[in-house]
Amino acid sequence: MNSEILNIPDIHVGNMIIDYLKSHDRTQSYLARVLEMNVANLNKILKKKSMETERLFEISMKLDYNFFAVFGNDLNLTDAGTYKITMPELGLHIERRMRDLRMTQMEFEEKTGIRRSDVNRILKKVSFDTDKLRVISDALNYNFFKDFYSAKDDPMAEQQNEQSNMGMILRLEELAGENRLQKQEIENLKKENLYLKTKLTEAGIEF
């Protein structure tokens, strides 16, 4: 039902890129060269239906073509000069959407097939497989592919970027706090261990 609302196209990403190269009289050898990889490795990547968003972002940048806009049904924002493209903190965006929907990790698992034990790891990721991101988008009724781009000189997009940056800052502060707590726990355990060793030594017990 959600996929009908969003209407995110089910795309073979490799074929989409190959078709683009052909229509613009460019070869796979050219793409391999600008990506600084050998042609054999590129061929393997392009044979696959899906691709990591980080890789698709790189290819979009190198070819000056917004492939994410195809997933977003914004074909008017595919060509150079019509859009701004950014690499969002996808995990943060997904987590924020879950909070907005008040969706539990159990519900997220039911809708996406991602195990609850993996959810926290997923929410810290920056790059996602395009097929997986499509599933997550459908489950949360939000097209996350649109977070990669905006219309050029769109003031609303600038505001969203600022909010995203603030979210990243808050996440970093949260992780720093967790790190400090973990370090303190380790120090406490070391002190406790030293205390126990001292007591055992005083009692004449070898260890």
Regions found by a protein language model. Give the residues of each.
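Short C-terminal boundary/hinge segments that cap the last helix of small helical domains
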Residues: 64-81, 141-158
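Short, basic-rich loop-to-helix N-cap that marks the start of a DNA-contacting helix
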Residues: 48-61, 125-138
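Helical coiled-coil/dimerization "stalks"
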Residues: 12, 53, 57, 79-80, ...
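Short alpha-helical DNA-recognition segment
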Residues: 24-41, 100-120
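Heptad-repeat coiled-coil/leucine-zipper oligomerization helices
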Residues: 104, 161-185, 190-192, 197-199, ...
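N-terminal, leucine/charged-rich tether regions that mediate assembly and partner docking
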Residues: 1-45, 55, 65-71
